[in-house]
């Protein structure tokens, strides 16, 4: 079995790319996990969504592929309007940064990456049993070329 260089995976590189954005948007940012969202607030997770990865297959043998991820966060949650508006505002700003970075060629350091985009706006997913924290979610897509 081959040894996997986990630091060189697309999901790890995407996490590295997102870290400075999170540090800018949330001074209490802790960590981006892979396929795991902790129970404390200010935790984030990148979860790969199963989709067909091949978008195009060229005659030259080049393939255009994509990965789709659910980027989830656990945030404070309550009936307080201001708190919930902050959660919504976080994802609006996050989406603007991702779109601007893509337009300006600021992309994750992934081999042959062509683009990154948010496929939706961040949205409430679920609240915990106490109603004090909630999971929010936005989908990210990267498109890359395989030669």
Predicted regions and their residues:
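Charged, often glycine-rich, active-site loop that binds/positions anionic groups
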Residues: 42-52
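Charged, amphipathic alpha-helical segments and their flanking helix caps
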Residues: 1-38, 52-147
């Amino acid at each position: 079995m081959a040894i996997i260089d986990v630091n060189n995976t697309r999901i790890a590189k995407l996490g590295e790319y997102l870290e400075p954005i999170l540090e800018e948007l949330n001074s209490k940012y802790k960590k981006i996990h892979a396929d795991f969202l902790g129970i404390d607030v200010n935790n984030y997770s990148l979860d790969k969504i199963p989709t067909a990865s091949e978008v195009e297959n060229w005659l030259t043998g080049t393939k255009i592929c994509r990965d789709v991820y659910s980027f989830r966060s656990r945030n404070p949650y309550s009936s307080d309007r201001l708190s919930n508006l902050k959660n919504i505002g976080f994802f609006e700003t996050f989406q603007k940064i991702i779109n601007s970075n893509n337009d300006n060629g600021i992309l994750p350091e992934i081999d042959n990456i062509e683009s990154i985009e948010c496929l939706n706006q961040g949205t409430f997913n679920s609240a915990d049993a106490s109603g004090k924290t909630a999971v929010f979610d936005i989908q990210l897509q990267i498109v890359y070329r395989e030669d």
